[in-house]
């Protein structure tokens, strides 16, 4: 099943969310015209400074022990996410 994770149009933001019993902390940072992510899973930082790309799984390595798929998708085309379209043009999707 697919779920949309609420995200605001801020250049830098941090939020916590529980995804299917997994404690997740997202930190998104804007550098120039690119969006980067730090990700903490169950109190263990597993990603530090990964660039966010359109339709690319953000937590793709099995050794992270993350259950599911997490990605941004462009609802109006095929561009990589930038902060001023988050939550509208670019939505953050979790698939369990």
Where are these regions (language model features)?
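Short, surface-exposed loop and linker segments with low hydrophobicity and enrichment for Pro/Ser/Thr
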Residues: 19-33, 83-85
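Short beta-strand/loop motifs in extracellular/secreted proteins, especially
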Residues: 13-15, 35, 89-90
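Short, charged/polar N-terminal "headpieces" of proteins
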Residues: 1-25
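Short, exposed beta-strand/loop patches in secreted or surface proteins that constitute
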Residues: 6-8, 28, 60-63, 83-84
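Acidic, aromatic-enriched beta-alpha/helix-loop junctions
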Residues: 30-75
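Short, compact, well-ordered microdomains
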Residues: 4, 75-96
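Solvent-exposed, flexible loop/coil residues
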Residues: 9-11, 55-57, 87
């Amino acid at each position: 099943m697919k779920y949309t994770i609420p995200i605001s149009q801020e250049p830098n933001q941090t939020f916590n969310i529980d995804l299917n019993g997994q404690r997740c902390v997202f930190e998104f940072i804007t550098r120039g015209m690119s969006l980067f992510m730090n990700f903490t899973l169950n109190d263990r930082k597993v990603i530090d400074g990964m660039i966010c790309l359109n339709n690319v799984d953000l937590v793709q390595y099995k050794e992270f022990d993350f259950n599911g798929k997490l990605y941004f998708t462009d609802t109006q085309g095929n561009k990589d996410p930038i902060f001023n379209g988050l939550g509208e043009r670019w939505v953050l999707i979790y698939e369990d």
